[in-house]
């Protein structure tokens, strides 16, 4: 039951954080939804890389792993919204859709690697 509630609370907080951060980014900058989701997903990749490496060094980190990795970052990042935004962007401008796809995948892998590297340096 600990896992259920820990993931449930983390996922809810992650989803709400994603929503408000995307609204904030779109209001405070000139970017639209696909690019706001890109930034959020990259931040999430950095976070999941960092926290997975950092928490793996702790002996009693299972609740934190459930809360942060599965829950919060699972709710914060979103593959389904990414794919929907990608298709919508592709209907408007195909080159931008491919750029967005490349930045999500390449940037996500890079950010996850940097997160691992940062955690090992701490």
Curated annotation (Swiss-Prot):
The answer to whether the entry has keyword Transmembrane helix is: yes
The entry's protein name is Fluoride-specific ion channel FluC
GO annotation terms (biological process):
cellular detoxification of fluoride
**Chain segments annotated as transmembrane:** 1-21, 35-55, 67-87, 98-118
Q: Name one GO cellular component term.
A: plasma membrane
Q: What is its main location?
A: membrane
Output the Gene Ontology terms for molecular function: fluoride channel activity; metal ion binding
GN (gene name): fluC
Q: Which UniProt keywords apply?
A: Cell inner membrane, Cell membrane, Ion channel, Ion transport, Membrane, Metal-binding, Sodium, Transmembrane, Transmembrane helix, Transport
Domain of life according to the entry: Bacteria
Explain the purpose of this protein. Answer: Fluoride-specific ion channel. Important for reducing fluoride concentration in the cell, thus reducing its toxicity.
Where does this protein hold Na(+)? 74, 77
What does the activity regulation annotation say?
Answer: Na(+) is not transported, but it plays an essential structural role and its presence is essential for fluoride channel function.
Q: Which family does it belong to?
A: Belongs to the fluoride channel Fluc/FEX (TC 1.A.43) family.
Q: What kind of membrane protein is this, topologically? A: Multi-pass membrane protein
Instruction: Provide an example Pfam family for this protein.
Output: CRCB
The source organism is Dichelobacter nodosus (strain VCS1703A)
Q: Which reaction does it catalyse?
A: fluoride(in) = fluoride(out)
Q: Does the keyword Nuclease apply?
A: no
Annotated localization? Cell inner membrane
């Amino acid at each position: 039951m600990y896992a259920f509630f820990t993931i449930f609370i983390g996922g809810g907080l992650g989803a709400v954080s994603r929503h408000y951060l995307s609204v904030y980014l779109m209001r405070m900058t000139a970017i639209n939804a696909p690019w706001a989701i890109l930034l959020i997903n990259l931040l999430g990749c950095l976070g999941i890389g960092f926290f997975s490496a950092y928490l793996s060094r702790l002996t009693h980190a299972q609740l934190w792993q459930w809360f942060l990795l599965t829950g919060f970052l699972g709710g914060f990042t979103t593959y389904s919204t990414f794919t929907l935004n990608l298709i919508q962007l592709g209907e408007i401008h195909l080159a931008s859709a491919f750029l967005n796809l490349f930045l999500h995948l390449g940037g996500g892998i890079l950010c996850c690697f940097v997160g691992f590297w940062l955690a090992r340096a701490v």
